[in-house]
């Protein structure tokens, strides 16, 4: 079960993602108290995991095609301010470069007031989903749409 999007993962973020008209992806999500490192702060690894997830989902949002996949080659995260848990945060991912073999994305985590808390640049190698998921139960690992009433972020 995915630690970021897995709806059945009780210890994960269970983060929803929204494809935007400009080809970016957005998320309204909240870290939980069991995601802390120091009191009042989210663990840096979980911040990086969200930065990574938004990059791949930005590819899907740009092309409106969830059959496109890749695996992370490099991840450069910058921690700007402490990221709190138990509060709604805003995530955004945007594709910045694409080739036949790879793609790159910039991802951002903001508080509700628009203050940048963390951001990152991710490079991915394109890889077919059947190679990535070989031998796995893919229910939580593959995207599927869930209807909701969100109309604006």
What does each model-identified segment do?
Residues 12, 72-74, 102-104:
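Short coil/loop residues immediately preceding or within conserved phosphate-binding loops
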Residues 84-85, 96-153:
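HotDog/MaoC-like acyl-thioester-processing domains
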Residues 37-41, 70, 115, 129-131:
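A short, polar/proline- and glycine-enriched secondary-structure boundary/capping micro-motif
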Residues 18-20, 94-98:
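Short beta-strand micro-motifs enriched in acidic
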Residues 1-34, 140, 145-153:
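Non-catalytic linker/capping segments at the edges of enzyme domains
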Residues 26-53, 66:
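A conserved, well-ordered hydrophobic junction motif at loop->secondary-structure transitions
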Residues 55-90:
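Hydrophobic beta-strand-centered segment that forms part of the acyl-chain substrate-binding groove
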């Amino acid at each position: 079960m995915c630690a970021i999007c897995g709806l059945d993962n009780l210890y994960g973020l269970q983060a929803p993602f929204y494809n935007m008209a400009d080809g970016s992806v957005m998320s309204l999500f909240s870290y939980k108290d069991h995601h802390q490192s120091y009191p009042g702060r989210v663990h840096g690894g979980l911040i990086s995991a969200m930065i990574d997830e938004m990059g791949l989902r930005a590819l899907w949002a740009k092309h409106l095609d969830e059959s496109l996949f890749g695996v992370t080659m490099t991840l450069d995260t910058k921690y700007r301010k402490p990221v709190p848990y138990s509060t709604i945060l805003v995530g955004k991912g945007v594709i910045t470069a694409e080739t036949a073999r790879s793609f790159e994305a910039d991802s951002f985590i903001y508080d509700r007031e628009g203050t940048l808390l963390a951001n990152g640049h991710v490079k991915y190698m394109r890889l077919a989903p059947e190679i990535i998921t070989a031998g796995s139960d893919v229910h939580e690992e593959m995207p599927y749409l869930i209807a909701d009433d969100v109309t604006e972020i």
